[in-house]
Each structure stands twice: as structure tokens, then as C-alpha cells.
């Protein structure tokens, strides 16, 4: 799969979580901050990244850089996704279902951030299994990356869309 050039896109960032993590050493605890960020152009491109640093702004900056390296293209049909899909990652599972125009983004927390920045405006989703933000985001991105348009599937099979849909 080809890499998407982030410099050609107008990306928007959204910080999902900031977590203070500790390393216990002989003299006490050493604190660092872990940031989880989602970036997207609201037009079919989205990515997520993590960063860790001594200070919060540095962790966010690192997470944004990481997210720009992990962009994926999301096939959209109007304001929604082409078909129902389940995204999996670890114990996290996210169910994504296309919705009629005007429904809005029905999703919780981290999943909502990914879907909104991907440019999906109408969708139904349900988080199943793990509700850890990183697992939910990875499961959502996994599901979105496996989406295919009817035209693409028809082309792969050498058929017309009408033949495919019956």
C-alpha cells in the first residue's frame, strides 16, 4: 500500500488522551506523559499516533508526527461508509454500520474522534470488548482500512456493479 503524503493534506489534530505514566526508581517515581492523537482531513484520510515525553506539549508533538506517518484512506459513499464492518484489535472490537443522511456520528469517545476526522458524517457504531482508548482507535482504523466500495470489488472480480449487487 502506498504512503499518503501528509504535506499535501490540510490535517486537523485531536488529542484523545493524555496519560501520566510513572517509572519507579530507587529515589522515587519518574513521571512522563503519554499522548494519543488522531489526525485527519475530514475528507477520507485519517491516522493516529502516540508520543511520550517529559512534558505534555512534547508528547503531543511527537504523537502528531507519528500520526502523520500512519495515515490511511477511507472510502466514503456520500456522508457514510460503503458497508457494515467489524474492526478488531487485541480485545477491542468496534462495529461500524452505515447510516442514512442526517443521522450524525453515533459513536463513543475515541471512535468518534477517528470517524469525525475521517470525514464520516453519518454512521452508527458500537464498541464491543476492550474500551481502552488505544485499542478502540486501532480497532476503528482497522475496520476503516478494510472497507471497499462496490465499484472496486466489481472491478477486481471483472463484473459490473449491477451484476455484483444482483
Curated annotation (Swiss-Prot):
Gene Ontology CC terms: small ribosomal subunit
Record remark: domains: The N-terminal domain interacts with the head of the 30S subunit; the C-terminal domain interacts with the body and contacts protein S4. The interaction surface between S4 and S5 is involved in control of translational fidelity.
Organismal lineage: Bacteria, Bacillati, Bacillota, Bacilli, Bacillales
Function as written in the Swiss-Prot or TrEMBL entry: With S4 and S12 plays an important role in translational accuracy. Located at the back of the 30S subunit body where it stabilizes the conformation of the head with respect to the body.
Keywords, comma-separated and alphabetical: Ribonucleoprotein, Ribosomal protein, RNA-binding, rRNA-binding
rRNA-binding listed as a keyword: yes
Assembly mode: Part of the 30S ribosomal subunit. Contacts proteins S4 and S8.
A Pfam family: Ribosomal_S5_C
Domain S5 DRBM: 11-74
GO molecular function, one term: rRNA binding
Family: Belongs to the universal ribosomal protein uS5 family.
Source organism (scientific name): Bacillus anthracis
Name the UniProt record assigns to this protein: Small ribosomal subunit protein uS5
Gene Ontology biological process terms, A to Z: translation
Gene name per UniProt: rpsE
